[in-house]
Amino acid sequence: MPERYNRVLLKLSGEVFGGGGIGVDADVVSAKAREIAEIANSGVQVAVVVGGGNFFRGAELQQHGMQRDRADYMGMLGTVMNCLALQDFCEKAGVDTRVQTAITMGQVAEPYIPRKAERHMEKGRVVIFGAGSGMPYFSTDTVAAQRALEIGADALLMGKQGVDGVYDSDPKTNPNAHKFDELTYDEFLSRDLKVADATAVAMARDNDLTMVFFNLEMPGNISRVINGEDIGTTVHR
């Protein structure tokens, strides 16, 4: 792992925004926004992809009989609500931000344009990506990998809720689960690990994008990962 990443894509799940519940937990989002602002103000270029699971999950709605593409679009709109919440708290913490969405909604966000996102980051702004890929059937993990590649990020930081890395089985149900400090992409995929979408990991492998899985709940962990501290699990070639 390098001493310090210069440009990162941070993936935040919707569960983080909800603090484990439905809607937005202002205290939790405010705390993460302060961390992100501190990192951006230190000179690291930061982009964020946010999920919408605290509002809607397309796959779960499908299980209840809803058409999958419509359910996914509902999930995408949920991510935009999270984007706006994070934007507000980041700006209160002292860093300029821009929200870009894959579904056009000019009153609240810019359209997603990779080159424009890069220019924003070069100027010290945090760029927050919402509305997934703008298309159904794509997970937020896959969108995060795609966005990281499009903006030339040094690494994709996968902030996790309730787990501090990648394990060989679910540590919540198996007290003997083994945590990996490092994995290759192929090891991750061959073990069929469920902590991230396989399509996202395959995309990272094919383009040599480092992924770091870490516990987002621990204060200061985002900065620790960016500065090269050995926490979480690094997935690379």
Curated annotation (Swiss-Prot):
Family: Belongs to the UMP kinase family.
Positions of ATP binding: 11-14, 53, 57, 161, 167, 170
Subunit (UniProt): Homohexamer.
GO-annotated molecular function: ATP binding; UMP kinase activity
Keyword set, alphabetical order: Allosteric enzyme, ATP-binding, Cytoplasm, Kinase, Nucleotide-binding, Pyrimidine biosynthesis, Transferase
Record's GO cellular component terms: cytoplasm
Gene3D superfamilies for this protein: Acetylglutamate kinase-like
Signal sequence segment: none
Subcellular location, record wording: Cytoplasm
Pfam family, one: AA_kinase
Start and end residues of each stretch annotated as Involved in allosteric activation by GTP: 18-23
Protein name: Uridylate kinase
Domain of life per record: Bacteria
Pathway assigned to this chain's UniProt record: Pyrimidine metabolism; CTP biosynthesis via de novo pathway; UDP from UMP (UMPK route): step 1/1
EC number: 2.7.4.22
